[in-house]
Amino acid sequence: MDVVRLEPMTVIGVVVDGPFDQLGTLVSQGWKRLWDEADSIQDRLGDRFVEVSEHLGDGHYREILGARVTASARTPDGMERIELPAASYVYSVHTGPLEGIAVRFGEMQEHSRSLGHEPDGVLLDEGYTPDGGQLHDLYVRLR
């Protein structure tokens, strides 16, 4: 695991909002919708899709399932756009089943604390593909 700096990025996609215990179902439905509408996202930066997760407090999360795009990309109807500022992140690569990603994020958060950094609640997972690719770049944003 390394600490890296990412430049500002724009993500356009489908938003899922809910309590942690419902995220599995909600996120699965969100990905289905995104795959159905992915071609409407223009000016994508790469072929892999991302999930940006933000812990809003009290066990409530907001997820955007989408694609990194150019800053000038148009937001399709029914989708949302978020702007992530430049920031430092703990970075790791995950290969293998998707079910292992949550565990890896937990390890990354603990690692960041061991380095004296506090995570700010934003997680970035880049690596989703319609055919279920197994390589994911994981990022835990630091305060």
Features from the language model and the residues they span:
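A solvent-exposed interaction/effector surface
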Residues: 1-143
